[in-house]
Regions:
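Terminal-region recognition feature
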Residues: 1-116
Length: 116
């Protein structure tokens, strides 16, 4: 697959890469990019959306708020994360994180990985 990505890809090749089970997800990016990450849970109203990860992180020495859609690697993880589709709790959680970023003057880094 890596060799093929170095050449011109057809539209169908791009779709296949986007759907590939082993492509990086938010957890991979957090592990590879962040020196540290403190995940925050819940929307402070109803509950926590497992389809959205967010929290405080350090990337390249810079403190940031990180928000991203979470997809699982298998069926069970996908069901737990609602296949990466945010619920109302997830949108409230994202708003909570963005308000915290504004309050503390931190940049927001977002990873959008939604189905469809």
């Amino acid at each position: 697959m890596a060799k093929k990505t170095q050449t011109k890809l057809s539209p169908w090749d791009i779709v296949q890469i986007a759907r590939h089970a082993e492509r990086p997800n938010i957890a991979d990016y957090i592990r590879l990019l962040c020196e540290d990450f403190v995940e925050l849970h819940g929307d402070r109203l109803f509950g926590d959306d497992r389809g959205l990860i967010g929290g405080f992180a350090t990337i390249g020495g810079e403190k940031v708020v990180l928000i991203g859609h979470r997809k699982g690697r298998g069926v069970e993880e996908n069901i737990e994360a609602n296949f990466g589709m945010a619920s109302p709790e997830g949108y409230r959680k994202a708003m909570r994180l963005m308000r915290l970023a504004e309050k503390y003057g931190l940049p927001v880094v977002s990873f959008v990985d939604t189905p469809g």
